[in-house]
Amino acid sequence: MNKEQILEAIKAMTVLELNDLVKAIEEEFGVTAAAPVAVVAGGAAAAEEKTEFDVVLASAGAEKIKVIKVVREITGLGLKEAKEVVDNAPKALKEGVSKDEAEEIKTKLEEVGASVEVK
């Protein structure tokens, strides 16, 4: 039996027959099919695009009062809490947000002179 004949035989098998074949090969040769699959899955996970981002206020810049107002609008914090966040920059403003939301927040803050990082 050559390689092509083996492949044709495998193509003709049902899922249950393939499952039995894999188990028989594992037993016969003392290997597991799970190890290579886990390695491939791990590589694929690393290649996936990041979906959650953190918005970090790096510095307030010259227009601190305007930045405090925008921080209040974004976070829903009170005046005192928003001022503390701005005074203690670099500070995370929002964590685990979508890329679009992170870019929107970054744009709002940069418009009033703040320096912002999206991580």
UniProtKB/Swiss-Prot annotation:
Database matches in Gene3D superfamilies: 3.30.1390.10, Single helix bin
Keyword Mitochondrion in annotation: no
Family matches, as CDD domains: Ribosomal_L7_L12
GO cellular component terms attached to this protein's record: cytosolic large ribosomal subunit
Keywords: Ribonucleoprotein, Ribosomal protein
Transmembrane spans: none
GO molecular function, one term: mRNA binding
Keyword field contains Plastid: no
GO annotation terms (biological process): translation
Family affiliation: Belongs to the bacterial ribosomal protein bL12 family.
Quaternary structure and interacting proteins, as annotated: Homodimer. Part of the ribosomal stalk of the 50S ribosomal subunit. Forms a multimeric L10(L12)X complex, where L10 forms an elongated spine to which 2 to 4 L12 dimers bind in a sequential fashion. Binds GTP-bound translation factors.
Function: Forms part of the ribosomal stalk which helps the ribosome interact with GTP-bound translation factors. Is thus essential for accurate translation.
Naturally occurring in which organism (per UniProt): Lysinibacillus sphaericus (strain C3-41)
Protein's UniProt name: Large ribosomal subunit protein bL12
Coiled coil: none
